[in-house]
Amino acid sequence: MAAPAGCQLYLAAPAELPPDFAATLTAVLEAAEIACLRLPPRPGMAHLVRLAQGRGTAVVIEGDPDLAAALGADGVHLPDLKTYGAARDRLGADAIIGVSCDRSRHDAMEAGEAGADYVAFAADLELVRWWAELMLVPVVAELQSPDQAAEFAAAGAEFIALGEALWRDPAGAPAAVRNLAMLLR
């Protein structure tokens, strides 16, 4: 995936989903193309998985491969590499397995060598740039603000991830996603 033109949106749902989250998610998915949605590990979310997948959005579950399998999600987002092997065994070769690496080059290289489908870094521009220049495994830049998106896309991030800042945007999550998608074009 090339950047910045190939940079895609990756959304992390809030840890606590509000009662109207399905309606908000529907509006967000209609506002822009979302490559991936990360959901918190909660049972009873199969309807959200189906909703996102029905719009062509891959869904990963935070940290719980068994729940990901039970919900029919596309994969799992792991907090570190410790359970990567078990997750791959549980979900199979076709599942998406991403690994959070915070700001660690070493952890990211180990995740890439293990076969992770993507690595995720905290908002560290130089680290994202370094990874994108040297490695083939896609990088997700976990940002705190949509204002950082263009800079990280230009640095080579294949995916821009936003969480709470997007869902709590004063203009509303659909407007925030639409603006972010236009920024990344």
Language-model regions, residue ranges each:
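Conserved N-terminal beta1-alpha1 strand-loop-helix module at the mouth
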Residues: 1-77, 90-97, 102-103, 109-117, ...
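Short, acidic/turn-prone active-site loops that include or flank metal/cofactor-
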Residues: 16, 80-84, 102-104, 123-125, ...
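Generic structural marker for isolated residues within well-ordered, non-membrane alpha-helices
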Residues: 25, 84, 128
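Short beta-strand-loop elements within alpha/beta enzyme cores
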Residues: 118-122
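Charged helix-capping and loop-helix junction motifs
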Residues: 124-128, 176
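C-terminal binding/interaction regions
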Residues: 159
